[in-house]
A protein has these predicted regions:
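Structural signature of FAD isoalloxazine-binding scaffolds in flavoprotein oxidoreductases
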Residues: 17-35, 82-113, 127-134
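Phosphate/pyrophosphate- and phosphate-bearing ligand-binding catalytic cores of soluble enzymes
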Residues: 16, 102-229, 233-248
Length: 248
């Protein structure tokens, strides 16, 4: 800030699409240097860069349930809080007790769950330009074998239904109220639709995959085409879940 250089903070980058021209300014990765996890009773305190899978496994080893849904999400806990990540009917807001952030002036703030304005794939963190540094999760006692059994079941379901063999930025569009994005895309006849190296997954139409040589421009064009065709056929507006950053 002293030198007026723009900066961006990344976790694992799981739900991001970076423009083909890259990101102007400094990019700060939060994963390796900020991945500490501590357990205290039923609470887990994790630095923002800690991976969800690692936290879920730590919770299981300590007989703490509540993180099962997140075990297969390939992201950091900081990023998961920012977008209120979720799967299989559960969301981060179900287990967050409080979050520590830095504001634009570098002051540390402690925010409880209600102060985060958590909704479907939403929090107030981006609009307030906060940087998540640490998260406190409140979990519940549960038998470790039951936890691991559920985690295994959910991961198998994920592998069965999602195109994990191809690179993607995860679920491409948010779920419109009363609909499922993937089904709308499929019903619009767009299964397998391709622009350059980007393709609507034939396995799950809610995912846009990289077949090997896709550019960010390919993916953006495909997303526009899909959104336009779904709106034209069904009158439903698809809102991107993928966050686009950098220069396109």
């Amino acid at each position: 800030r002293q030198y007026h250089v723009s900066y961006s903070f990344f976790g694992n980058g799981s739900n991001l699409l970076v423009g083909d021209k890259g990101i102007r300014g400094v990019v700060i990765e939060m994963t390796d240097p900020m991945g500490n996890i501590e357990v205290d009773g039923t609470k887990i305190t994790a630095q923002a860069g800690a991976m969800l899978s690692k936290i879920a496994n730590t919770a299981a080893s300590n007989g703490l349930g509540g993180m099962e849904f997140a075990a297969g999400i390939p992201g950091s806990v900081g990023g998961a809080v920012v977008m209120n990540a979720g799967a299989y009917g559960r969301e981060m807001k179900d287990i967050i007790e409080k979050v520590y952030v830095l504001d634009e002036n570098g002051a540390q703030l402690e925010l409880d769950r209600d102060a985060l304005d958590l909704g479907y794939r939403h929090s107030c963190i981006p609009e307030k330009k906060y940087i998540v540094t640490k998260v406190v999760l409140e979990l519940v006692p549960r038998n470790e074998a039951e936890i691991r059994s559920e985690m295994k079941e959910l991961n198998e379901k994920r592998a069965e239904k999602q195109p994990l063999q191809y690179p993607s930025a995860g679920s491409t569009f948010k779920r419109p109220e009363g609909y499922f994005a993937g089904k709308l895309i499929m019903d619009a006849g767009l299964r397998g639709y391709q622009v350059g190296g980007a393709q609507v997954s034939e396995k799950h139409c809610g995912f846009v995959i990289n077949k090997g040589d896709a550019t960010a421009a390919d993916i953006c064009q495909l997303m526009r085409d899909v959104s336009d065709k779904v709106q034209a056929q069904f009158g439903v507006v698809l809102e991107p879940e993928v966050k686009m950053i950098g220069e396109f």
